[in-house]
Amino acid sequence: MLEQMGIAAKQASYKLAQLSSREKNRVLEKIADELEAQSESILNANAQDVADACANGLSEAMLDRLALTPARLKGIADDVRQVCNLADPVGQVIDGGVLDSGLRLERRRVPLGVIGVIYEARPNVTVDVASLCLKTGNAVILRGGKETCRTNAATVAVIQDALKSCGLPAGAVQAIDNPDRALVSEMLRMDKYIDMLIPRGGAGLHKLCREQSTIPVITGGIGVCHIYVDESAEIAEALKVIVNAKTQRPSTCNTVETLLVNKNIADSFLPALSKQMAESGVTLHADAAALAQLQAGPAKVVAVKAEEYDDEFLSLDLNVKIVSDLDDAIAHIREHGTQHSDAILTRDMRNAQRFVNEVDSSAVYVNASTRFTDGGQFGLGAEVAVSTQKLHARGPMGLEALTTYKWIGIGDYTIRA
């Protein structure tokens, strides 16, 4: 089955690579229209997936990621339309010039070819990834989690209908609808057909892909994100940022999971934090230095376990640790961070600059929420993933991250001397 999908995707990629920006945008507009026109079939399929997931005891965080509503589906369709408005990087000349030999040389952006994406209970990823791949002239093979099997099948069917109505092969966007995990291992060895693989899931999936894939892998998306409250932070303003970073949508990878508090501000900051977290329904996991003071406040508090500093809660839980100074905070982030998104709240610009320079994450913030690490917020459109590695792409992966380049030399029967 996968062999045939690979062949179909590779053949489709050749046709997609020849499309103009106008033609690709027409396809995307058609997909957005069809997602709205056929929303009932997608929502019905999603309702079945959600019911099964509830019966199987899926966590609240995962259920939130899985569930579609009419508003969410409309938002997904609108995101596709936003991709239409983005500049097409394909065909862009990055640099070039004329050599001494007279050869005119240029480096031009081109599609990667076929993208493989493995993800969990995130039905929006199906459309986000498909739209970005099509905009950049790439075919895509999707493997969603078993929890989204019906939703993905219904969504991809709508996308394929739109493709065919525009004269393009259905092989441009395909989904593996068999939940057998053995197919993941088979997909990881499809280097004959797939040019880049993007896993979007937990640490186990990323480890599996790194160890077994014969395809170049872009890893990331695991967000053990930190906010360091420096001793010069403005408490009231800092709390607004922390509430946003923790509670706006706790199930996302850019949600803060650990709060590092400078010891010199702890006595005034912790009571205010407890009051605010109680109002926000957040459970605090406190270290020994913060535990007694936080237990005296209104928030729900438990003693932090050492392994929780490495956890991506994806829920209304927040670690709180007292640190001696900026060096201590940076050391903690280096040990427990996932190089996703980390922030400092401070009025000391020297400390801010040190934090930016010394915290080696894909996104580092000064006096701002970690929730900004998002393709839409960065002006990149819907993102295919957030990369926490350093080669090829880093941070939210927009259109350029789905391209490579080729060197093109144009001569007049020019030969090398």
UniProtKB/Swiss-Prot annotation:
Keywords linked to the UniProt accession: Amino-acid biosynthesis, Cytoplasm, NADP, Oxidoreductase, Proline biosynthesis
GO biological process: L-proline biosynthetic process
Keyword NADP: yes
PROSITE patterns: PROA
Catalysed transformations (reactions): L-glutamate 5-semialdehyde + phosphate + NADP(+) = L-glutamyl 5-phosphate + NADPH + H(+)
EC number: 1.2.1.41
InterPro entries linked to this entry: Ald_DH/histidinol_DH (IPR016161), Ald_DH_C (IPR016163), Ald_DH_N (IPR016162), Aldehyde_DH_dom (IPR015590), G-glutamylP_reductase_CS (IPR020593), Glu-5-SA_DH (IPR012134), GPR_dom (IPR000965)
Domain of life (superkingdom): Bacteria
Keyword presence, Endoplasmic reticulum: no
UniProt cross-references to CDD domains, sorted A to Z: ALDH_F18-19_ProA-GPR (cd07079)
Record pathway: Amino-acid biosynthesis; L-proline biosynthesis; L-glutamate 5-semialdehyde from L-glutamate: step 2/2
Main location group: cytoplasm
Name of one Pfam family that matches: Aldedh
Job of this protein: Catalyzes the NADPH-dependent reduction of L-glutamate 5-phosphate into L-glutamate 5-semialdehyde and phosphate. The product spontaneously undergoes cyclization to form 1-pyrroline-5-carboxylate.
HAMAP family for this protein: ProA (MF_00412)
Similarity remark: Belongs to the gamma-glutamyl phosphate reductase family.
The protein, known as: Gamma-glutamyl phosphate reductase
Biological source species: Escherichia coli O6:K15:H31 (strain 536 / UPEC)
Gene designation: proA
